[in-house]
Amino acid sequence: TRGVVMVFDLFTSNFYLLLSIWIAIPIITFFYLFFVTAPYGRHASTNWGPSMDARWGWIVMESPSVFLIGGLCIFFRANLSSVSLIFVLIYIFHYFHRTLIWPFIAEMDGKKMPVFVAFLAFVFNIFNVLFQCTWILFIANYENSWLTSFPFILGILIFVSGFYINVRSDYMLINLRKAKGPGYHIPRGF
């Protein structure tokens, strides 16, 4: 438990520096991927080491976004306000679907994923959870009046809209594959 507290002390005291580095990583990766093809999906490759079942790779790589954030919020529950609890529950709701529902409705039978890709995504999600928890549990101070504020209501509306679009799009693509078979198809309409 002391180690967990030390990690959050480090994150809290260096939050904006670490966040700046975290934001720089995808910018660097964006340019890097002009020269290297990521070995995932239709570009899957054995050049990146051993592979694993894509469904289980997905579940493993996304799992910190459900279980780690839940565990940390239980561990630091004294730091949770009503508003921050709502933020965490929304976050877990989204990632519960992405982690434990989507992989079982998506067509992934027989597909493989490099273990290295699953590992990198797993590490990414650990850091993402640490940033989210550091902000929600230690830095932000949301009073209950925030629940009726314009930014909160707008944020909830954006989340609900985005979640709906995301899930509906998933099901559209899944149904398109069922109707037209394997391969890549462009959906029409929404």
Regions found by a protein language model. Give the residues of each.
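Active-site acidic catalytic loop and adjacent metal/ATP-binding pocket
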Residues: 190
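Membrane-anchoring alpha-helices and their flanking helix-loop junctions
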Residues: 2-187
